[in-house]
Amino acid sequence: MIRSASFRAIGATALLGLGLGGLFASACRQKAAPAPPMATPSVTLSREKVPLGGPVDITYKFVVAAGATFTQNYRVMVHVVDPNEELMWTDDHDPPVPTTGWKPGQTVEYTRTVFVPVYPYVGDATIQVGLYGQPNQPRVPLAGEDMGQRAYKVGRLQLAPQSETVLSVFKDGWQAPEAAEHNAAVEWHWTKKVATLAVKNPKRDSVLYLDLDNPGGVFEESQQVTVSTAAGTPLDQFTLTPKRATLRKIPLPAAALGADDNVDLRIAVDKTFVPSRLSPSSKDPRELGVRVFHAVVVVLAP
């Protein structure tokens, strides 16, 4: 009886071992080796603490793996998430050099200026980067900390209250604000021939980030834009081409801003237009100059 019982126990153990071995072998066969990373992403920020609504220059860098070959063009996915991994905003974009032009071992580096949305949150945020193609395709494997679905953690950003930015007010010479039909976060003001931006004088060397365009369609002529102080001190002059968004980073020396607590900056254009006079289908009687999306003063670090 003991021998028989021992036999049955040994037989059951052997069968169990064979069964588990088969399961492990099957699992090993089913689990594919991870795909090798195609590149290593990283970002560098011009400043790590940014007030809501303020600009930050983000330098993206991709170090292409030695054996990597990109056979299609991918977009760069940029997600900014809060500590609970909730998505706050995105900055997806096409890299200036299409990924089919990336070479093994090459370093691809470029800088974009992002204006932080006025989001109902202040505190730490995480920047995630990825590469994606068609909607149903998996994202490209990259080297780094995968936060899920090949979204890789590349940096952190501290969001500060909007009150920490230099106060500026659209004073005179502006049309009422407008917003994009399908994205209320995209807002702009049209100028008239001369528009005044009232700024609380930082009394330090600063930079005016002026983000503007002429969308074209109705008015297709280039415009000369001049930025100066109310006292007439010239700060910048440039040509604005229709259908081409322009970001000007205009130096504001403390000496040019003067000693008053507030200073007016003037944006003047040489040509304005009235849509209803140029297009029979338009009923817009306003005088329009250029379309300004952002006009933000940033104090330079000491």
Predicted features, each with a name:
Residues 1-8:
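N-terminal secretory signal peptides that target proteins for export/translocation
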Residues 11-22:
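Bacterial N-terminal signal peptides
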Residues 28-302:
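C-terminal luminal/periplasmic domains and tails of membrane-associated envelope-modifying transferases
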